[in-house]
Amino acid sequence: MIYKKQYGHPFDTESVVGSFVSAMETIPYLTREPDGFSYAMDPQDILYGLGENIRGINKRGWVYESKCSDDPNHTENKSSLYGAYNFMIVSGKATFGFFIDYPGKVTFDCGYTDLDTLRVTVAEENYDLYIIEGESPTDIVHQFRQLVGRSYIPPKWAFGATQSRWSYMNEDEVREVVANYRTNNMPLDAVVLDIDYMERYKDFTVDEQRFPHFADFAAEMKAQGIRLVPIIDAGVKIEDGYDVYEEGVKNGYFCTNQDGTPFVAGVWPGRVHFPDMLNPEARAWFGSKYKFLLNQGIEGFWNDMNEPAIFYSEETLKKTFAKIDEYRTQNLDISSFFAFKNLVAWLSNNENDYKLFYHNTKQGRMRHDKVHNIFGYNMTRAAGEAFEQLEPDKRILMYSRSACIGMHRYGGIWTGDNQSWWSHILLSLHMMPSLNMCGFLYEGPDIGGFGSNTTEDLVLRWYGVGIFSPLLRNHSAAGTRKQEPYRFKNKAAFAGILQLRYLLLPYIYSEYMKAALRDGMYCMPLAFAFPDDDFARQVEDEVMIGESLLIAPVYEQNARGRYVYLPEEMLQVRVKCSENDRMETTVLPAGHHYIPVELDEVVFFVRKGHILPIAKGGDSIQNVASVNFADLRLFAHAPDGAAYEYYTDDGETKDYDKPEHFVHITLDADGNAKSDCADVKVEKA
C-alpha cells in the first residue's frame, strides 16, 4: 500500500507516474520535525537504498546528501556523488519504504549524529512524501517501481562488452582497438568515443580531421559488429557561427542569469551556456539535435557532465582573481597560505554558482539550486523523448552520469569517475542492488578504474564482478596506464572471462528483461532473497543476480580465494577462464566455506532447484549477434527437478510484452530437459 503526504507547494518533478496512492493525514512510522522527519531505529534495523552512493549496502552509520555533484574522488568521507535517489527502505522491527519527491537537496543522517536515529532534512517544505508498506523489502521495491514507472530497456547489443578511453583520438585508433580484440579472441560490441571526437568540444559536431568520413566509419564498424557510442555534454560552447549556440540564444533556450541574460559557465570548451532542460520547448529542441548523429548511423550515446558540472562561473572566476591579487603582497602565514592554495580548487562545483542561474519551467521561473537534482534527468529525458519521435520502433542505447529517480525510464547510468582502487571493486558491488531498488537496472562501473594507474590483477578481478553488470564497460582517463584487456600478459584469461560473459548472456538478458517488465530487481542483497536468514542480512560482499545466481567476487589484492556464506545448499560452478572456460561443478552445503579462486578463475553459485541457462560455447563468439540465445545448456542442482521462465526477443524492437517471448523450460529429476518452444533447444550441462 502506498500513502502520500504533500507539504507546501511541491515542484512537479514528473518522477511519479502511478496514481494508485492514498492520501494520509498523519504519517506512520516517522516523527515530524521542523525541517523534515526522523525515525527511532532498533539496533537490528537495516537501511537500504539511496542508489549510487559511497559505503555499504546497509546505509546505516553515515550522513548522505541528495545533491548531484561532479566529484571523481569516491572516498568514504564523501556524502554525495553524481545522482539523487531519495528512496529508502527500513527493514527490521518495522519494514516500510519512503520516497521524497523533491528536486533540491535532501540530507539523510542515518545514525551519524545520533547512532539510533534516522533523520531526514529537506531543504524546503515543498515536497511529496510517499510511505510504502509491503510484505517484504522486495514487495516494497515492486510497489515503488510501479509508482515511478518501467525501467529503461536497452538494445541487446548493449549487454556486450564495451571498450572506452578518454580518448580514442581518430578512426585508426578505434580500428586498432577492434583489431586487437578480434586478434586475441576477445568479444566486443561497442567502442566509446569521448570528448575528442567533437570539433573543439562542441556538442553535435564531429572533428573532420580526426573522423573525416564519420557515417562511413560508423557503417564500417557496424559491419564488424561494433557500435560507436559518442559522448554528449551538458554545456553548449559560446561561439558565433555554431548553429546549436545561435539557435539556443535566438529562441531563449538557455538557462539565464537573474536579469534574463544567458548564464555563462566554464566546462571543457571554455565558456558555455546550459540548455534549460526544465523548459519543455528547450528540452525538445536539445533532444532533436541527437538526430545529427542518428542520421550517421549512431545507435547509442552517453550523456556526461550533466549534474551540471561547473569548472567556474564568470562571477566566481572574477572574485578568485581579485582575491589572488589581494594575496600577492601579503606574508602568507599558516592561515592565509592554505586559503590562497584552495582558491582555485574551490572554483569547481562551487555551491554559490548553482544559485546564480534560473530555469523557465511549466511552474514558472525557478532558481537552479532549488531544482538542481533533476537537470541531468531531464537532459537524458530530452534524448529519450526525441528517440521516441525519431526512432519510434527501435531501441537506442543511452546512459548518463547524473541521474535522479524518473530518469530510469529514459536511460541507464555508469557510476562515474571511479579510481583503480581495490576498494572500488567492492563499492561497485554495493551500488548494484541499491541502484536496482531505485529502478536503475542498466548500470555498471568503469571496469579497471577510471582514475589512477591500474594493475593486471585488479582488472581481472574487476571483470569477475563486471561480467554480471548489465553495462560491461572498461574505461580509463587520459594520462593513466592503458587498460584494454589485450595489453596485459595473461591474454587467455581476459579472453576467457569476456567469453564467459557472452556464454552467460541468455541468462543475464532474460533476468534483466523480466526485472524491467515486472518492476523487479535484476540484482538484490542476499537478505532480500533469504529474508529469514539472520546471517544473510549481514552479508555485504555477496549479491544475487536474478533468481538463480549468487556471486561472491574476490576484491582484495593478492587474495587467492575468500570465505563465502551460502544460505542454502548450492551448486558451485568454477570457470577456468584461461582454459577455454572449462567448467567444474560441485554441490556445497549451506554454511561458510573458504573458496579458492585463482586469478584466471570465476566462481559462482546456482541455487538448489533453480536453473542457469547459458549459451553453447565455441570459438565464434565475437559479439552479441554471434551468441545463440536459442541453443542452451542448463546448469542446475535439481534433485527434485526445476523450472525456469526464459525470456528471449529480437533485442532491437519494442514489442517487449508479447507472450511468445516467454519460454518455459523444465528439468526433471533424471536430468531430462524440455522447453515449450520448438525454437529454443535445451540440454543439461
Where are these regions (language model features)?
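Extracellular structured ligand-interaction cores
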Residues: 82-86, 93-95, 103, 126, ...
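Short acidic-glycine loop/turn motifs at beta-strand connectors
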Residues: 89-94, 257-259, 567-568, 669
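Aromatic- and carboxylate-enriched substrate-binding clefts and catalytic-loop regions
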Residues: 187-494, 529-530
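N-terminal small/glycine-rich loop or linker at the start of catalytic domains
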Residues: 150-164, 261-274
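Short, hydrophobic/amphipathic alpha-helical packing segments
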Residues: 64-68, 81-84, 175, 283, ...
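Catalytic core of carbohydrate-active enzymes
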Residues: 75, 374-375, 380-389, 393-396, ...
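Catalytic and substrate-binding clefts that recognize carbohydrates or anionic sugar/phosphate headgroups
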Residues: 1-155, 165-166, 171, 178-183, ...
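Glycine-rich, histidine-containing beta strand-loop boundary motifs that form or position
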Residues: 41, 50, 91, 99-102, ...
